[in-house]
Amino acid sequence: YHNFFEHYGLSATRGFGIQLLTGKSIGGGTSINWQTSLETPTEVLNEWDQLTKQQDYFNSDVFKESIKHVVDNLGVTTEYNHIPLKEEKLAEGFEKNNISYRVIPKNNRSTHGMECGFCAFGCGYESRNSSYKIWLENGNFNGNIYSDTGIQKIIINNDKATHIEVENNGTASRIEVERVILAGGSLNTPRILLNSGYKNPQLGKNLKTHPVSGVAAKFNEQQQPWYGSMQGMHSEDFLFKTNNYGYLLQGLPMHPSIFFPYFPNFVSSAEDFIESYNHWSGAIVLTSDTS
């Protein structure tokens, strides 16, 4: 957790209203994820065009070709995925309620290691097509990468970035730079800019999240909630209920170290949960909030 996740996987909003499971490894969400790789729906692209007044930029051939380039290079496919044992009850429930579902596309290159079930902690089988493996290992990157190094602030002199202050394994240093491209994500980019002295009142105030709720149940049959494909299938039947807003239903891997922090109501019955762990299965409901 200390190597791959922000704040050991326990990042949260002020007041702990929403917990944020965010990665920090090289390769980003293509390296530390559940391998679920979904293209942005046309309905959302239409909404982005409307909100940004970009005159069909997000629906343009150029943008769609860029998405296709990424998808193709990451090898996103359903070929190496299937519904694992832990999601069979969910699929059964969908069928009984006439809810359609489909196998989730993933960015893995083969079935090797697919049943491991620990993809969220890094792939020990090198079977994941992360951006690190695709673009960096193939010689498409000309430069140096410094892992375990966090940028604290940018030093500005005469309206120009001249240095960055970084910390590596507890050691702080200042590095001279010619230019800076800041790509710290929606959580860290505002923080770095604020630390650097930027005064824009909008910095850090417009983050939108898509809240996730979870359900879990204990069954008589063994479920192996830690094993197999991290996520095998999902349902989009309720994704666009009203004006593009609704919810997405997906299976849930239930490793205790991930499960307990995000399902605090189970803590009081932790002993029973651990003793009967092999008989539990769960699902998540991803709410579509403002884009």
Residue ranges of predicted features:
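Short, conserved beta-turn/loop elements at beta-strand boundaries and strand-helix junctions
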Residues: I156-N158
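A general structural signal for short secondary-structure junctions and capping/turn motifs
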Residues: T22-K24, E92-G93, E137-N138, A172-R174, ...
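FAD cofactor-binding and catalytic pocket of flavoenzymes
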Residues: N200-S291
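Short alpha-helical segments and helix-capping/turn motifs at coil-helix boundaries
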Residues: F16-Q19, K86-E88, K133, N168, ...
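Conserved redox-cofactor binding core of oxidoreductases
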Residues: W34, L51-I151
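Hydrophobic packing residues within well-ordered alpha-helices of enzyme cores
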Residues: L45, L90, I192-L193
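N-terminal glycine-rich phosphate/pyrophosphate-binding loop and immediately adjacent elements
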Residues: Y1-E47, S60-D61, V166, K199-M230
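Glycine-rich loop(s) and the adjacent beta-strand/alpha-helix scaffold that form part
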Residues: T149, I154, I164-H234
